Structures are given as structure tokens and as C-alpha cells.
Amino acid sequence: GKNFFCYNNRLNSKDFIEEVIIPNLRSDVEIIYLDGKEIVSDYPPKYISVALYRLHNYHKFPHLLAIRNDQVVDMSVNNVFYTILDQNQPLDRLFNQMNSFFNNK
């Protein structure tokens, strides 16, 4: 399966995600960036937009996406991400939650 970390251009988190989160993601996690309505990814935008359209919490970024057995599974990490960011907490909880999601086959 494929693993994706999706984030958007929200000003109060974009730099933190790009400078702190993305460099520490597992090597098997690919990035999808939403710059407004434009999808920036190594995959064709049409393919990604179909997957994003099916997200349960589409506006709750950052978001995790996994493709398992041709099924799209997703989870928002918005709450834990912003709690950590706003309260300057260690990132362990966020990475543990993300790794648990990606490990779930």
C-alpha cells in the first residue's frame, strides 16, 4: 500500500510542517500539498483529487491517507497536531499516532 501525508497552505502551520514534520516522516510516506485548490504531488492531480474528495474530514488538515487493497483509508491528525503546535509539546504523540495509522494494514 501507499502512505500519504496531506497538508495545506494554512499560514500558521505550513512552515512548521515543512521544516519539522516532513523531514522526520518515514521514508515510505509521500507528500500531498494543497496550495489553495491546486494539488502538488508526484501523482496526477486527477488521481489525488478523487482520493481527497473521499476524505471524511476534508477540511481538517494535516491529514493521513493510506491505500490498502485498493481502498482509501484516512485519518485527520488536526487535533493532536494543533494541540502540540499551540502548546509547544513534544512531537512524540503526533508521530506515534501517524506511525500507528500507517502500520495498520
Residue ranges with predicted function:
Residues L34-E38, H63-L64, F95-Q97:
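Short C-terminal domain-edge/linker segments immediately following a structured domain
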Residues K37-P44, Y58, V72-V73:
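A short acidic, often aromatic-flanked loop/helix-cap motif at beta-alpha or helix-coil junctions
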Residues P44-Y53:
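Short, surface-exposed amphipathic charged segments that create phosphate/polyanion-binding patches used
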